[in-house]
Amino acid sequence: MKTWSFTQYEHLEYLQELTNANAKLKTIIGNDYMVAPDVVVYRMPIDDEELNRPFTVVDDETATMTEIRSINNSRPLLLASVSAKWTMRSDRAQNSRTEALNLIRNRKGQAPHIVVVTGEPLPSRIASLALGTGDIDCMYHFALYELVKAVEEYGAENGRDDIVEQLDTLIAGKRLKDISDLPLDLAI
């Protein structure tokens, strides 16, 4: 599914058509506005009958511009973009950050949740992406509890309290969570 398939980014389809038709425009604008998330979570707009169950919420005079109403919008709404990175080399971390910034910068309307799922075993590499200015909502580790145990054991055996502290900081700061938290966080 192309990013422009979603209501927040539908204008990018028109921009793509313009740049494809005009070489000068393409050299000026480029195409860095296009994002290809690994996984997307979206919902379709809802018809008024469903929205008005069990009592009236919308009518011809209220909520006339909201994209959640199917009468106003036929495209899906992007709720979350998930970047999947098995490991976190610095270039991979930068790709996730670039994807996130493009989604934030190029949207019209509500920003989707922007998260990264990883299996990276090194806290310093996780921190390279998890710490930052909020372009990534949160990182999720596919085996966080096992990682914490392994880092604590390694840190104790090798006098590396720094890596234990770094991992604790990421977790306490709500920058890193276990993958089991992801579905519930996206439900909010």
Region annotations inferred by a language model:
Residues 77-81, 108-111:
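Short, surface-exposed connector motifs at secondary-structure boundaries
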Residues 2-73:
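Active-site metal-binding core of divalent-cation-utilizing nuclease and nuclease-like domains
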Residues 49-54, 87-99, 110, 124-127:
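Active-site-adjacent loop/helix micro-motif of nuclease/hydrolase catalytic cores
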Residues 81-84, 89, 103:
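Conserved catalytic-core segments centered on acid/base and nucleophilic motifs
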Residues 39, 78-84, 96:
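Conserved catalytic cores of phosphodiester-cleaving nucleases, focusing on short active-site segments
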Residues 43-45, 85-88, 118:
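Short, flexible loop/turn elements at secondary-structure junctions
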Residues 106-188:
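C-terminal tail/extension regions appended to the core domain(s) of diverse proteins
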